[in-house]
Amino acid sequence: MDNDIEVDGVIGVSAGAIHGLSYVTRQRGRNMRYNMKYRNNKHYMSMYSLITTGDICDEQFCYHDIPERLDPLDYDAFVANPTRFYVGCSNLETGEAEYLECTDMRNPSDVNKVRASASLPLISNTVEVDGMKLLDGGVSDSIPIFAFRRMGYRRNIVILTRPEGYRKGPDRMLRLEAGRYREYPEFVRRCHMRHLYYNKTLDKLEELEKQGDTLIIRPSQTIEISRLEKKPEMIEAMYELGVYDAKEKLQQVKEFLRESREDAHGQAEKQTAVTEEER
């Protein structure tokens, strides 16, 4: 945002969907601000919330109180921005990914799309959108680069949360997931296969990067941080690493976008930023 980096489309998965919102509204530092402020609030992300609501992140507090009142999301800026915004969710009945566009975050359906994308299995309630039963998009498609390419976004900036060389191992929670979601065998199968799809996507991403169609931004080092981290020093360290690595890639990003605009004899191809889930 500090360097006026703009793209045609954004797709986010899980926490990437939540962070992507503040990028589209151009509210720099918003996610970091409320994460630090409310990290110990029992309604923000806690066992209290899980026990009392069925969600590790309380729906009312996280998806209404914060964006509507405590640290307002700029709804007008979201609608006014021509950048199209999508989130990735997992369909429990089919096991497949659903890529859903959000056009107005005042619309309860769009709020539920984002909530579904970030609703982790076992510690979240199922979210229903347009008759679909949905959960965290990371299960079915953690890095939705190919979905965006099918939509016509041929040149992509991909933001990963793991350093170079990382590969995901088998799901350690599979037995619990198989029991909890036994009525949804396709979803359980996807949980079982998740690491294979994830690692194959990383392999393909590296090929696209070599071809020049994709620019990858990833952490330059490993920081051992938990998925539900509350320690302020760990959150701050991860944030500062992200800022540092983004600055290191800034000139490459500008050049990548300039080349995109010059493609096809002056007719710009679509450009996009793709964010990976944090899991």
State what each model feature region is:
Residues 1-10, 21-279:
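Patatin-like phospholipase
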